[in-house]
A protein has these predicted regions:
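Amphipathic alpha-helical "coupling" segments that flank catalytic cores
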Residues: 1-695
C-alpha cells in the first residue's frame, strides 16, 4: 500500500511560552487519538513548535483506510426476540449501539445457547477526505487558558492564526479555519527570512524551515542555548544561573536563539543581589552571571531572537532595558531605607490577609504570639524566644515597601536586609528571610530553630484561619496552597522542631477567637488534624513506606506528624532490614490477638496465674515499662525490640496453657492477660493491620 507523509502547520502570532509548551503536549495526544478514531494507520506522529507555529508530522499515512468487519455478540435470542420473532427493546438497543439495522442481526448458537450478533462493516475511505475534519478538530481541540477572537469571525485560538499549511505528500489538504484555507506555503523567521516559502512535499517542511532560520525542535533550541552559554562561561570564567522554569520559557520565546553577554553599571551592585536577579530572571528572562565563588557580577546573558550580525545593537538595547529596571530597583531600595523596618508594620492595617480573617496587621499579632509559644514549647532560651517574637512582628513589614511592591518575589528577603540596616539581630534578620521556607518539598529549611518557629507560625496561622472559615482544600483545588504549607511544617517537625502540633493548633485557633472571628472551633480543629495526618500519609507513601505500615501506626491514635513518620520508618525498617525482628513482632501479636476478648478488659488477677502465666505477666509488665520509656524518648527501634522480645514468653504460654479452660475464672483471667499483652503492642501500632505480611 502506498503511504505518504502528512505535514500540518498552524502559523500564528507569537504564542505565550508556557501555553505553547502545553499546546505541544496536547497536540501530540489529540493527534494520536484522532488518527485512531478515524481508523487512519500511521508510522509515527511528531509534534514541533516555535513561538509562531505548531507543526504536526505523521509518517506512513496510507491513501485509503482498510475496510473493517467487526462482529459483536449481543443478548440471547430468547431475550432479543418475542414469541412472534420481532426484535425486543433489548435487540433494538443493541443494534442502535453498534450502528446496524435491527434487520441485519444474526442468530448463532454458542455452547448450546442461541445469541444475536451484529456485524458492522466499515468500507475503506480515502484518507484525504477524512483529513480536513480531523485537522480542523485538532485546531479546535486545543485548550487554552485565555483564547482570543480576532477580526470579525468567531473562531478562537490563543493568538491570531495567520497561515495554515497542510500537505499529504504533494497534495494540499483542504482545511479551513478562521477564514484561512490551508496551502503549501510557510513562513520563516520573522526577521531573518520572513518568506513566504513554498513547500513542494510534506517531507520537506522541516528542512525548508531550517533553511529559513527556524529551529522547530524545542529540545534542540534548548541544547543550542545551553551550548552557547557553556561557551560564554568558559570564555569569561563565570557561571550562569539557569533556573529550569526560566530556561523553559526562554526556549519558547525564540525561533533561532543566540546567547549574548550584556553588562550593567557596577553601581547597581550595591542593591541586594536578590532584586537584581529577580529583575533579570523574572522580568527580563536574562541569566545573571556569578563568579565561581558565588558573587554576582555586572554581566548577564540575553538570548536573542534577532540577527546575530547586529549583536552590538541587540546588546545595547537590552542593556538599556536592564539599566532602567535596576535604576528603579535602586531607587526603591534607597527610599525604603529612609525608615526603619518597624515603621512599616502599622501600614499592614491597609493590607487584607483574607476577606473573612481581617488584615495582615492582625495576622502579624497572631503569628507573633504563636511564634513565641512555639519557641517556648521547643525549649529555646529566653533570648531566642524574644528573637522569634521580634522576627514574627517584623516578618510581613516589607510587603508595603516599594521594592517588594515592584519585585514581589523578594518578599522576606528584602525584609531581612531592612532589618539588618535597622540594627536588628542577625538571628532576627535571618528568620525574616527564612519565613517562607520551605516553599516546596525538598526546599531548604530555615537555618535556625528561631526561623523554624516563625515560619511554622506563619504557615499554621494561615492553615487554621482558612479551615476556620471553610476555605480548606477540596479535591484537587487548593487555591491558598495549604497542602504545600502543611508539608513545610511537617518537614520542620521532622528536622527537630520539638513542638506539639495539636497544642499549636489549639493556640492558633484561640488567637482567631480572641480577635472576634466566629467559627466552630471543635470542627475546625478536627479538620485541621485530619488534614495534617493525611499530608503525613502522603509524605510516607512518597518515601516508599507501605500503606499497611502507615495504617498500622495511625491505628495507635497517633496524630503528631513527626511521631507518625518516625514510628512508620522504624516499623518499615524492621520489616525490610530486620525480618527476624519483624517475624517475632508479627507472630507474637497474631497469636495473642486471635484469642483476645476486648470485653474482658486487662485487669489480671495475679493470684490465679500459674508459673508460665506469671512469666508472661512479668515479661509484659517489664516490656510495658521499657516501651513507655522508649516512646518517651522517641526511640521507636528500641520499642520494637522490646515487643519482639515477648515472642518467647507468649510461645511458651500457648504451649503450656489452655486459654479456653473449663474453669470460667481461669479462662477470663487468661483472656485478660492476652488483652494486656495486645495493649502493649497497641501503644506502638496495630500489627493486625499487617496480617497479610505476618505469614
Amino acid at each position: 500500500m502506498t503511504t505518504q507523509t502528512l505535514a500540518f502547520e498552524i502559523g500564528t502570532e507569537e504564542l505565550p511560552a508556557f501555553d505553547l509548551h502545553n499546546a505541544t503536549i496536547q497536540m501530540d495526544k489529540l493527534a494520536h487519538a484522532a488518527f485512531e478514531e478515524a481508523g487512519i494507520p500511521y508510522g509515527e506522529i511528531s509534534v514541533y513548535s516555535t513561538p509562531r507555529r505548531i507543526i504536526l508530522i505523521a509518517t506512513e499515512v496510507p491513501e485509503v483506510t482498510q475496510a473493517l468487519e467487526e462482529v459483536f455478540k449481543g443478548p440471547s435470542a430468547k431475550i432479543a426476540f418475542d414469541e412472534n420473532g420481532n426484535p425486543t427493546k433489548a435487540a433494538l438497543g443493541f443494534a442502535r449501539g453498534k450502528g446496524v439495522d435491527p434487520r441485519e442481526l444474526e442468530r448463532r448458537e454458542e455452547k448450546g445457547v442461541e445469541y444475536v450478533f451484529a456485524t458492522k462493516r466499515t468500507p475503506e475511505k480515502h484518507v484525504v477526505d477524512l483529513l480536513p475534519t480531523l485537522l480542523h478538530g485538532l485546531i479546535t481541540g486545543l485548550s487554552w487558558p485565555r483564547p482570543q477572537r480576532w477580526g470579525t469571525g468567531t473562531d478562537q485560538f490563543r493568538r491570531p492564526v495567520r497561515w495554515l499549511l497542510a500537505l499529504l505528500g504533494t497534495n494540499v489538504v483542504n482545511v479551513e479555519f478562521a477564514g484561512l484555507c490551508a496551502g503549501n506555503t510557510t513562513r520563516g523567521h520573522r526577521f531573518l527570512a520572513p518568506g513566504p516559502f513554498t513547500v513542494a512535499h510534506a517531507d520537506e517542511l522541516l528542512g525548508v524551515l531550517e533553511n529559513a532560520y527556524v529551529v522547530t525542535s524545542e529540545a534542540k533550541r534548548e541544547e543550542i542555548i545551553r551550548q552557547q552559554i557553556k561557551a560564554i562561561e568558559e570564555k569569561t570564567g563565570l557561571v550562569a544561573d539557569l533556573p529550569e522554569k526560566v530556561m523553559a520559557e526562554v526556549v519558547n520565546l525564540v525561533e533561532y536563539p543566540t546567547a549574548m553577554v550584556g553588562t550593567f553599571d557596577e553601581l547597581f551592585l550595591s542593591v541586594p543581589k536578590e532584586i537584581i536577579v529577580d529583575a533579570m530572571l523574572v522580568h527580563q528572562r536574562y541569566f545573571p552571571l556569578f563568579t565561581k565563588e558565588g558573587a554576582l557580577t555586572n554581566k548577564f546573558i540575553v538570548t536573542s531572537n534577532g540577527n546575530p550580525e547586529f549583536e552590538a545593537n541587540i546588546i545595547d538595547g537590552n542593556q538599556r532595558v536592564v539599566a532602567a529596571r535596576l535604576y528603579d530597583a535602586k531607587f526603591f531600595y534607597d527610599e525604603d531605607l529612609k525608615k526603619p523596618l518597624e515603621a512599616y508594620v502599622d501600614d499592614l492595617e491597609n493590607v487584607v490577609f483574607q476577606e473573612s480573617l481581617g488584615t495582615t496587621r492582625a495576622k502579624v499579632s497572631r503569628i507573633q504570639s504563636l511564634a513565641g509559644e512555639l519557641a517556648t514549647q521547643a525549649g529555646l532560651p529566653e533570648e531566642d524566644i524574644t528573637d522569634a517574637k521580634r522576627a514574627a512582628y517584623l516578618a510581613k513589614a516589607d510587603l508595603v515597601t516599594s521594592a517588594v511592591v515592584e519585585f514581589t518575589s523578594v518578599q522576606g528577603i528584602m525584609g531581612s536586609y531592612y532589618a539588618q540596616a535597622a540594627g536588628e539581630t542577625a538571628q532576627v534578620a535571618q528568620a525574616i528571610a527564612d519565613q517562607y521556607r520551605p516553599r516546596f518539598a525538598g526546599d531548604t529549611l530555615p537555618q535556625s530553630k528561631v526561623g523554624m518557629c516563625v515560619a511554622a507560625a506563619d504557615k499554621l496561622d494561615t492553615i487554621c484561619g482558612l479551615f476556620a472559615v471553610g476555605q480548606g482544600p477540596t479535591g484537587s483545588s487548593d487555591p491558598f496552597a495549604l497542602r504545600r504549607q502543611a508539608i513545610g511544617i511537617i518537614a520542620m517537625l521532622q528536622a527537630g522542631l520539638a513542638i506539639s502540633l495539636q497544642s499549636a493548633i489549639d493556640f492558633a485557633l484561640d488567637s482567631y477567637c480572641s480577635q472576634g472571628i466566629e467559627f466552630d472551633k471543635a470542627e475546625a480543629r478536627a479538620q485541621i488534624i485530619d488534614f495534617f495526618v493525611t499530608r503525613t500519609k502522603v509524605n510516607l507513601k512518597d518515601s516508599g513506606i507501605r500503606p499497611d505500615t502507615i495504617d498500622a501506626v495511625l491505628a495507635a491514635q497517633v496524630v503528631e506528624p513527626a511521631v507518625i513518620i518516625a514510628r512508620a520508618k522504624a516499623l518499615e525498617s524492621a520489616r525490610s532490614t530486620e525480618p527476624d525482628t519483624f517475624d517475632d513482632l508479627a507472630t507474637a501479636f497474631a497469636r495473642a490477638n486471635n484469642l483476645r476478648n476486648e470485653e474482658a478488659g486487662c485487669a489480671v488477677d495475679e493470684s490465679l496465674l500459674e508459673q508460665t502465666e506469671h512469666a508472661l505477666y512479668n515479661a509484659i509488665t517489664n516490656a510495658q515499662e521499657k516501651v513507655n520509656e522508649a516512646l518517651q524518648t522517641d526511640d521507636y527501634a528500641a520499642a520494637l525490640q522490646q515487643l519482639a522480645a515477648l515472642r518467647g514468653p507468649i510461645d511458651t504460654f500457648f504451649q503450656d496453657i489452655m486459654v479456653m479452660d473449663e474453669n470460667l475464672a481461669l479462662r477470663e483471667n487468661r483472656l485478660k492477660l492476652l488483652n494486656l499483652f495486645v495493649s502493649v503492642f497497641a501503644q506502638v501500632a496495630n500489627f493486625g493491620l499487617m496480617a497479610k505480611s505476618v505469614k
